[in-house]
Amino acid sequence: MPRGVAIPEVRQHLFSAVERVIGRDGPGRLSGRAVTVEAGVATGLLYAHFSDLDDFLAAYAVDRAFLVSSGASALSGRAGEGSVTRNLCDAVLATPLETVRPWARLLVARPDLAGGVHAVLGAGTAGFDAIEAAVAAYLADERGLGRVAATADPAALALALVGLLHHVVLSADAGPDAPDASDRLRGAVTALVDGSTATARH
């Protein structure tokens, strides 16, 4: 990035850079310099917007948790429409896995950042917690409409679905020959949920 050139959405530009650093080198190699080199900007730009690296990472964690939470909110009001499985897959994949993966890896490496996310967005209402809550509420609504088996446990299914998402984003190989993570997740969600919806149809 040439010096003197204005960068629109500086924060998002830096957030995208930290995602690439985590994706390539892992969260253990993070530094302010690594992020700014990846972003193609002067090191001082990061510190012009954030007090230090921890402040930057906390802001990034909150921003991406909000994105994930917003994607989960798409389930609200979908009960009774379309396919139960498709609705769930669309909501879980509303935020691209390429965005979810580095964020999740960072939170595993830096669990202290979760406290900052909860302080800003609320405990139990952000990130994976938001997906779990939205899925449980949606499945309960579908159960009430008879589209999910009366014996199904919405909370347990929601927890299992979030566990699948967490496993896929943390274990996925980003290499060119790796299986598509979205396809893996869709297949797993279908296998998890279809039994309950099939039972409801009989």
Ranges and model annotations:
Residues 59, 72-102, 157-158:
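Hydrophobic alpha-helical connector segments
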Residues 13, 17-55, 59:
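Helix-turn-helix
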Residues 77, 89-99, 105-115, 187-196:
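Helix-loop "lid/cap" segments that line or gate small-molecule binding pockets
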Residues 1-12, 197-202:
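Actinobacteria-biased recognition of intrinsically disordered, low-complexity terminal regions
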Residues 97-98, 137-141, 158-179, 191-202:
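Amphipathic C-terminal alpha-helical segment
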